[in-house]
Amino acid sequence: MFGDEAEFPQLGVNLFVLAPGDPMGMYHWEADQEDFLVLAGEALLIVEGEERPLQQWDLVHCPAGTKHIILGAGNGPCVVLAIGAREHQNGAGWGGYTVDDAALRHGAGATEETTDPLVAYAPVPRREATRYREGWLPGA
């Protein structure tokens, strides 16, 4: 399910571990719905230009077209489970990156409207996948 070939091509599942201040990605909207569950720690949601604090077990539902991004917050790492539909994942019409003052203040915003991830992520260093580390999840 987490490999190159999706067992369920209509569903995407990702686990993010974010240090305080680290964004999950860039402020964007998608043509498909997404859901996020904070498994541990604290996070900051920027949704439709507004900042909202999140804590463990908070669930966020973003209907299609909702502009959003999540960042790590608090004093330590947070763990966020992201689940989303993948019907429009590839090709034209997937969504886009929009300019937002709150997202830019946190280093999580594109500087121009675009649908091209190479443009939106140009100033961001490439992220490397890592294995689970002891202590990331509560009670582990």
What is the predicted role of each segment?
Residues 43, 51, 68, 88:
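Surface-exposed, flexible loop/turn segments at secondary-structure boundaries
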